[in-house]
Each structure stands twice: as C-alpha cells, then as structure tokens.
Amino acid sequence: ACLMVRKSVYDEVNGLDESFAVAFNDVDFCVRVREAGYTNVFTPFAQLYHYESKSRGLDENPVKRKRFISEVERFQKRWAKQLAAGDPCMNPNFDLMKEDFSFDIKPLE
C-alpha cells in the first residue's frame, strides 16, 4: 500500500495498528481516518509498483495462514457496522469477499 497523510492526522488516529501485523493495517487506518471525519482520496495519476508479498512471502504455510485468518476475523469484528453498511465506492454487484472483481451472483427470487 502507498499512503500519504498529514502527520497530525496520522497522530490523531494513532497511526497504523500493529496488531494487524501484515494484513488490513492500511485498510483499518483508512477507516479510522474516515471515522475521524477526514476524506480518503484516490488518485489514478500516481504510478508505483507494488510486488505483493515479495519481501515476506505468501501466506501459504499454516502459521502464516492462521495469522491471516485471525486478522480477517479481527478486522471484520472491529468494523462490522461499517462493513454491513457497504463500501460507498464499491460497485454493489461485485463480491466483496473476492479480490478479482467477480460478480456477486444471487439467486433470483
């Protein structure tokens, strides 16, 4: 993740939560920034390369997988209300549990 924020805002929300050792520390931070009344802004004009998991490796071994699942559960519990309300920037037709923008196909009633 690449984040830019004023130091005063970073300090106000107590920075990144180290209990999210690998996953969700950036997302948790952005939700806390928004909850504090600030706006998160995305720019398509910045360009950078991020090689996901390049330095730490993938979450394939049992210990890393367990840590990841724990962080998912903790994030979902902490932000249950906000997650239930939905992401205002996310297309409601996409499956929120997948990273590939798959459609969330619901059976017809």
Predicted regions span which residues?
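C-terminal, non-catalytic tails of nucleotide-sugar-dependent glycosyltransferases
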Residues: 4, 40, 57-109
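A short, conserved alpha-helix in the catalytic core of glycosyltransferases
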Residues: 1-14, 19-49
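Conserved active-site-proximal loop/helix segments of enzymes involved in bacterial cell-wall
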Residues: 51-54
